[in-house]
Amino acid sequence: MMGVKSANAQALNVAGSTFVYPIMNKWIQRYHELHPGVSINYQAIGSGAGIAQYKSGTVDFGASDVPLDNKELATMPRPTLNILDVSGAIVLCYNVRGIGPGLHLSGPVIADIYLGRITKWNDPRIEKLNPYLHLPAEPIRVMHRSDASGTSYIFTSYLASVSKAWKDGPGVGKSPNWPVGIGAQGNPGVAGLIRHAEGSFGYIELAYALQNHMPAAVVENRSGNFVAASIQTTAFAVNSAVKRMEKDIRVSIVNGPGVNTYPICGFSYLIVPKFPANAAHGKAMVDFLKWTMTDEAQRMAADLLYAPLPESIRKINLKIIDTIKVR
């Protein structure tokens, strides 16, 4: 749990995504410096739990890496909007003795690891992609999320796009029925498992890999190129979605087009009330949402390797924010 407070502060409570927590933490600290009269408490409890808390009315707004679809919006107790905040990459990190950054993996190989079909690091399919590495004959210790996770939703969306067996089997979801592996709570939990378990392999948001100095795989994209996750390679995925977002900001950018596009990317969203019940909280929320779309806020996101939203998407987002009615 994280928050900043001051005397007589207007306090907002927010809960959800661990994917967005690193930048949300920085944003909240900076926003409090600019607006000492506003404090924001963010609970990084996972997208599913954040949506549940928003639905129950225990937080002012939620954070999820999966936007609410029309059916979910209809179940909310109050009119609700999806607001974009950042985009980022999900990386496959590993802890294999003697193997540093740059392990090459393809989508079908990643899917088969998570399906339990590839179980050893020296499997011929992994060796074929990495002819210059000496891979050990050790078990792959698969790690995944144990909570309802937007990061898992993005990752399983990718797996379904590259593997018919995954699409027809576990499928896409925040809490899929994982065929193999050990689960942990949140991105920090999975990162911790990978760091401390030799032979481990798992998916986390790029900022967590950076913070924990963990090597990440270079992944084959739709064009057949092996691409490392970065601000630029994530931005290629984001830019490919701009036209689609003019109609609806709820778009997938996994396995996107482009020779240099990193294939496992996604947006993160804030789940907000269209008619905030508390006028003071509503005004503070709207002001904060607008600030996240500023150049300063998006530059801060880039410092943590999230891809800043291009101006065209920020304009679309600001139009949605302007529909929030504070009584």
Kindly label every feature range from the protein language model.
Residues 3-327:
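Flexible loop/hinge segments at secondary-structure junctions
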